């Protein structure tokens, strides 16, 4: 597996995230060793590292530091951080009953809602400040680079996650989230009002009506984000254009206007994995997955499959190389 990953990194020049010299960089090897607290100064240094180490996973911090290679967080001298949202299909209700394709479609829809209904409509974040990435496996990462968010502390970011998830949905939380980012009125109050409907005059509505409307609003309009990823101001996140070690797929940027049609199992296969075939061994029956328009084998035993399929099955733990 490591040789296949090394080929990808040797045949591609990976562009680093902006201001890479101020970010902590880390990676995990195929032997399970975690290397952190690295400082990378430029594109050349990054690609030399990737070609030499051929890592299983690659990360960079959302935060900007004066000394990113210091091992203790206080000594790094935090100077701000991008605002990051992590959406994982494993968090979907009933995900264990869904196919991989169904899970990815649902989490893609959640990502669209986050971007259009919350980040753009409610928070007023311009499209130019938003970047969406397929995580390389089960979901999406949304990065916000905007002057209004860089210096937000953990508590302020937690308020934002509470607003988006609807976990503390009441007038106080909604209003504080809106005021914090200086956005127009609307958002949850408008959604709850719509759920209340016009069936009865406002002065005749009972408290129970409001509670039911809030419950429906939360169920129908909230987004399932992994909140700790957002409010942890020292979080490291997968580096764009690197490979995910549990799938062999690329952590790839998705244009906002293309998200609705995006198919990661077609568009995130490395070119280096499209040629050739490998033997894999399935120790037990599996639920088949479809990658690159090809359905995987499902019965136990030895199978000859395309390289990208072999990488995915082995990386995800479904198969081994014999």
Swiss-Prot record:
InterPro entries: DNA_primase_S, DNA_primase_ssu_euk/arc, DNA_primase_ssu_PriS. Pfam families: DNA_primase_S. One of its GO terms (biological process) is DNA replication, synthesis of primer. Disulfide bonds: none annotated. Keywords: DNA replication, DNA-directed RNA polymerase, Magnesium, Manganese, Metal-binding, Nucleotidyltransferase, Primosome, Transcription, Transferase. Its EC number is 2.7.7.-. It is an enzyme of class 2 (transferase). Gene3D superfamilies: DNA primase, PRIM domain. GO terms for cellular component: DNA-directed RNA polymerase complex; primosome complex. One of its GO terms (molecular function) is DNA-directed RNA polymerase activity. Its cofactor is Mg(2+); Mn(2+). Belongs to the eukaryotic-type primase small subunit family. Catalytic subunit of DNA primase, an RNA polymerase that catalyzes the synthesis of short RNA molecules used as primers for DNA polymerase during DNA replication. The small subunit contains the primase catalytic core and has DNA synthesis activity on its own. Binding to the large subunit stabilizes and modulates the activity, increasing the rate of DNA synthesis while decreasing the length of the DNA fragments, and conferring RNA synthesis capability. The DNA polymerase activity may enable DNA primase to also catalyze primer extension after primer synthesis. May also play a role in DNA repair. Heterodimer of a small subunit (PriS) and a large subunit (PriL). This is DNA primase small subunit PriS. The lineage of its organism: Archaea, Methanobacteriati, Thermoplasmatota, Thermoplasmata, Thermoplasmatales.
